[in-house]
Design a protein with these regions (language model features):
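A glycine-biased structural micro-motif
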Residues: 50, 102, 127, 254-258
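N-terminal charged helix/coil linker that caps or initiates catalytic domains
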Residues: 1-53, 299-302
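Short, well-ordered alpha-helices that flank and scaffold nucleotide-derived cofactor binding pockets
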Residues: 67, 71, 111, 198, ...
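A structured beta-alpha segment of the ubiquitous adenosine-cofactor-binding alpha/beta core
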Residues: 106-144, 148-153, 157
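Glycine-rich adenosine-cofactor-binding loop
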Residues: 41-86, 239
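Glycine-rich phosphate/adenylate-binding loop
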Residues: 1-18, 137-144, 149-302
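Residue-level detector of anion-binding/catalytic polar loops
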Residues: 75, 119-121, 170
Length: 302
């Protein structure tokens, strides 16, 4: 029992009905380390193979998320992005080739993934997310959303947050901040949402609103700062978090908190958690948006 509790004993019976493709057996063997002797080591992979994932955004190094998902084998991936492939993308968005320059990212990505795993249903959409309805149009039947939209900062995340709360679909959010990356996960009705995080920080930090205004008013557009090995650390964490939410092979690390990765030294930690404000939040609860100053600044920026 002690060895089993410590994960040294695995369920090793061969399941002839598992119907797991050989390409996924290394995944199964990995998951079995966490399942233990009483579980079904095939179950996490089966859940992945039957899942539908909506990926929002292919900028930065996010196309690498799509590559990792292809190796995990979800049944269907819906991808949405409005940009075209540029030469400057090729140093970190390694799904694309020189032949893709000038093509819509969503279409080029779908073509590339079809070559990696032809069994995945890929639905590409060349569109920009500017309101929650743009997400809700595609969320029916989706098991998990991954939000990697980086523009406009914070506003894009709030738009997606409204949509996933309305649809009651979990979402893993990820963003890069030059030398660091952050991941946080929202499960509607279970964790606090993105607006709960805004409420939490504005209630506890007297300077939060002021700092947000200062950031919002910056007119300078910095050059793209993205280094592929660093971005891979972030995208791997995002995808693993998505797998944890879908399969529960292990507990997700970013539920109601920000999981931060330091690209320079490889360390990681979780920020203090924020709760779900069911009575105060105007998005996932019963709160009045007009009572909270922070949301006024979001509206002013639109």
């Amino acid at each position: 029992e002690l060895l089993d509790n410590e994960g040294f004993i695995e369920e090793a019976l061969y399941d002839e009905e598992s119907n797991i493709a050989k390409r996924f057996m290394p995944n199964v063997n990995y998951f079995s380390r966490y399942i233990g002797s009483n579980g079904n080591r095939y179950q996490p992979q089966k859940l992945l193979n039957n899942s539908t994932i909506l990926l929002l955004g292919l900028g930065g190094g996010v196309s690498n998320i799509l590559t990792l998902l292809a190796g995990l084998g979800p049944k269907k991936i819906i991808i949405i992005d409005y940009d075209n492939v540029e030469e400057g993308n090729l140093g970190r968005q390694l799904l694309y080739t020189e032949e893709d320059i000038g093509k819509p990212k969503a279409e080029a990505a779908a073509h590339a993934i079809a070559k990696i795993n032809s069994n995945i249903i890929i639905e590409p959409y060349n569109k920009k997310i500017i309101r929650p309805e743009d997400v809700l149009e595609h969320v029916s039947g989706v098991d998990l959303v991954i939000c990697a939209i980086d523009e406009p900062p914070f506003i894009a995340q709030r738009i997606v947050n409204k949509a996933i709360v309305t649809a009651k679909v979990p979402c893993v959010f990820g963003a890069s901040q030059v030398s660091r990356g952050r991941v946080f996960t929202v499960i509607p009705g279970v964790t606090g949402c993105f607006d709960c995080m805004n409420l939490h920080y504005s209630m506890r930090d007297p300077q939060f609103n002021e700092q947000f205004i200062a950031f919002r008013n910056i007119e300078f557009s910095p050059p793209t700062i993205a280094y592929a090995p660093a971005i891979y650390q972030l995208t791997a964490a995002i995808v693993d978090e998505a797998v944890r939410v879908i399969t529960r092979y292990a507990e997700p690390r970013s539920l109601g908190t920000q999981y931060e990765i330091n690209f320079e030294d490889g360390s990681s930690f979780t920020h203090p958690t924020w709760p779900r404000y069911a009575d105060e939040c105007p998005t996932c609860g019963n709160g009045d948006i007009d009572k909270w100053e922070i949301f006024k600044y979001y509206e002013d920026k639109k």
